[in-house]
């Protein structure tokens, strides 16, 4: 099913994100190209913090997935995704990644712009649950805001990000408000800290997949 109102709502939502996040669509293109390079095609896929279903938009037209699970703690977002993608091979779970019930069930787990909203303890629990949800040799791909290594770097990166948003037509006040959320509404960690966290949670391989502005993609292999 592809309800017109759901499609409109998701398109409007995605356009607002594009005004905020540089190269937003590249997140999902990189997910697809990375999974395509894996030796075995995925049959089971969990997307945590699925939002309106942007990851599924790319995945379901690229792979013959037998089971795709949408998970989000927002019933409103989950309903939009359900309106767009309800089919026999899809499931919709309302819940928090820090409380995932899945164990050894998925070939792929994705989390796009999710885990940086948590405290250090909450982030570790979220990443550990993603690890536990994977089958052996399963793939975890996440995209997160990251923290620069210095105050000078942080100021430069934030100003650059603000300039990007201004160029997309956002108001100066909206841009300042968004940049002001750093370490108040989301809590980024450095690239090194993220990779170490993944190793601490059990991943035998942890790599940087993609990087631009203050966003990075990470790859973990169980």
Predicted features and spans:
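A short glycine-rich, Lys/Arg-flanked "PGG" loop and its adjoining helix->strand segment in the class I
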Residues: 124-136
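A conserved beta-strand element that flanks and buttresses the S-adenosyl-L-methionine
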Residues: 110
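Core SAM-dependent methyltransferase catalytic element
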Residues: 204-222
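Short catalytic micro-motifs in class I SAM-dependent methyltransferases
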Residues: 113-116, 144
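Conserved beta-strand signature within the Rossmann-like core of class I S-adenosyl-L-methionine
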Residues: 137-145
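Class I SAM-dependent methyltransferase SAM/SAH-binding core
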Residues: 46-48, 52-99
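C-terminal alpha-helical "lid/dimerization" subdomain adjacent to the S-adenosyl-L-methionine
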Residues: 145-199
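Conserved class I S-adenosyl-L-methionine
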Residues: 1-40
């Amino acid at each position: 099913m592809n309800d017109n109102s759901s499609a409109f709502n998701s398109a409007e939502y995605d356009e607002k994100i594009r005004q905020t996040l540089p190269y937003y669509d590249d997140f999902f293109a990189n997910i697809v190209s990375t999974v395509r390079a894996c030796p075995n095609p995925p049959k089971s896929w969990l997307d945590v913090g699925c939002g309106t279903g942007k990851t599924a938009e790319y995945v379901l037209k690229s792979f013959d997935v037998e089971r795709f699970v949408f998970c989000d703690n927002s019933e409103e977002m989950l309903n939009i995704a359900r309106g767009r993608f309800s089919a026999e091979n899809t499931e919709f779970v309302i819940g928090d990644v820090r409380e995932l019930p899945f164990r050894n069930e998925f070939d792929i787990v994705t989390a796009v712009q999710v885990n940086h909203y948590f405290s250090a303890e909450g982030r570790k629990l979220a990443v550990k649950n993603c690890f536990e949800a994977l089958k052996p040799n399963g793939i975890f791909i996440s995209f997160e805001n990251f923290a620069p290594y210095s105050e000078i770097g942080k100021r430069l990166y934030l100003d650059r990000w603000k300039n990007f948003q201004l160029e997309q037509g956002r108001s100066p006040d909206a841009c300042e408000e968004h940049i002001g959320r750093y370490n108040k509404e989301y809590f980024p960690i450095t690239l090194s800290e993220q990779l170490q966290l993944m190793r601490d949670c059990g991943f035998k391989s942890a790599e940087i997949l993609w990087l631009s502005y203050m966003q990075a993609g990470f790859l973990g292999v169980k």
